[in-house]
Amino acid sequence: MAINAQEISALIKKQIEDFQPNFDVTETGIVTYIGDGIARARGLDNAMSGELLEFSNGAYGMAQNLESNDVGIIILGDFSEIREGDVVKRTGKIMEVPVGEAMIGRVVNPLGQPVDGLGEIETTATRPVETPAPGVMQRKSVFEPLQTGLKAIDALVPIGRGQRELIIGDRQTGKTSVAIDAILNQKGQDMICIYVAIGQKESTVRTQVETLRKYGALDYTIVVTASASQPSPLLFIAPYAGVAMAEEFMYNGKHVLIVYDDLSKQAVAYRELSLLLRRPPGREAYPGDVFYLHSRLLERSAKVSDALGGGSITALPFIETQAGDISAYIATNVISITDGQIFLQENLFNSGIRPAIDAGSSVSRVGGAAQIKAMKRVAGTLRLDLASYRELEAFTQFGSDLDAATQAKLNRGRRTVEVLKQPLHKPLPVEKQVVILYALTHGFLDDVPVNDILAFEEALYDYFDAHYDNLFETIRTTKDLPEEAELDAAIQAFKDQSQFK
């Protein structure tokens, strides 16, 4: 058989064209240092900031420092199996967490992995932990109230859907209790809640989860926990993982309440990472970009425009102060980023005023826009009355000769303080808050002994539930007060038949 050279040439060319290489090209580096949740690797010249990197044992890290001769990597999870000389490769991806309805009711770590022993989470949707915040034109003014169920907040420092309201105070002043009560009050409000525990004891997180489960709040809540025993990178990433889960709901037109408990511990974890990565320290040894650490997180909370679905993320970040010093570095940073702050004072807490909210230092920059009309009408002057009472109370310690008007202000002030007290885990619906504040501001409590105020309040609610439920219904549906004469008559009828005369 004759062999044709042209045929052989064509056959070889075809085989070359059809050749499929069966190997992957990946950029790899070698670990030169490992310790304290930090690795350094040489050879990853094209790595991007924030890129996910995979170690040879299956662990993941995130590129943080891109230097001329190596890359500084924070390790996400356990680093005990990583050794110097191990291979680390680029993935070309940034860190993502699982999101979606399947996450609700679960307790997860900052990587989105379940830690509640209830099995795997059935979801395929993911979102990057770092995404840009909505722009100016993508936002909408905050106008819908977020009812916390706490009279002292809903009346004095109202919070709206899409607002960022800082909760600041010393340790053991009831910060977490305020947030848990706000979550409990969202039952039936078509609200999804996310509780991010940063650097808390695992026993404390367990207690909070059991509280949420006991009151049925876990049915609409996701808990993200990075406990004190976990490496610093997980504490640093936890709030971003939480807000990524929240954004999935917000961009689908839903409303989310997210609690960061607390950002002081995140800042400390970030300081630790930055110093280990040899970044230059600044004030209080924090790195220069610690403001950006919190601003890029909190700016992702917003009320988005109708074109984007009209959803919202409301953020309640916590900051722990030392001896009530709200002028500290991290505290002033977060105060300047947020739309107001609720300041909890240790001396008020210890004197039995709980929630221990200092009305003078607390403010909401959204204000009346986030209140229903009925609450605006009954709570309009409450803050000023309380401030003048505190001033008079301090003044009267120097003398006892008081005119009748001053005495009346002091009496009203004492009753105001009592009315604003509230038992733990007993949030009140807004219509009940409106009725008791109306009774207070219209003088119905002036002749009730201060020690009987809480009993009066409970009895008033029971009486209205039994005889005047239509008034509660009017406030609920119209968001406004019923006829004043009708409300006056109902409260007077209760006083006439009770022992509080």
Curated annotation (Swiss-Prot):
It is found in: Cell membrane. The record marks 362 as: Required for activity. ATP binds at residues 169-176. It is a peripheral membrane protein. It catalyses: ATP + H2O + 4 H(+)(in) = ADP + phosphate + 5 H(+)(out). One of its GO terms (cellular component) is plasma membrane. InterPro entries: ATP_synth_asu-like_sf (IPR023366), ATP_synth_asu_C (IPR000793), ATP_synth_asu_C_sf (IPR038376), ATP_synth_F1_a_nt-bd_dom (IPR033732), ATP_synth_F1_asu (IPR005294), ATPase_F1/V1/A1_a/bsu_N (IPR004100), ATPase_F1/V1/A1_a/bsu_N_sf (IPR036121), ATPase_F1/V1/A1_a/bsu_nucl-bd (IPR000194). Keywords: ATP synthesis, ATP-binding, Cell membrane, CF(1), Hydrogen ion transport, Ion transport, Membrane, Nucleotide-binding, Translocase, Transport. One of its GO terms (molecular function) is ADP binding. Its main location: membrane. Its EC number is 7.1.2.2. The keyword Kinase does not apply. Pfam families: ATP-synt_ab, ATP-synt_ab_C, ATP-synt_ab_N. NCBIfam families: atpA, PRK13343.1. Produces ATP from ADP in the presence of a proton gradient across the membrane. The alpha chain is a regulatory subunit. Belongs to the ATPase alpha/beta chains family. F-type ATPases have 2 components, CF(1) - the catalytic core - and CF(0) - the membrane proton channel. CF(1) has five subunits: alpha(3), beta(3), gamma(1), delta(1), epsilon(1). CF(0) has three main subunits: a(1), b(2) and c(9-12). The alpha and beta chains form an alternating ring which encloses part of the gamma chain. CF(1) is attached to CF(0) by a central stalk formed by the gamma and epsilon chains, while a peripheral stalk is formed by the delta and b chains. HAMAP family: ATP_synth_alpha_bact. This is ATP synthase subunit alpha. It comes from Streptococcus agalactiae serotype V (strain ATCC BAA-611 / 2603 V/R).
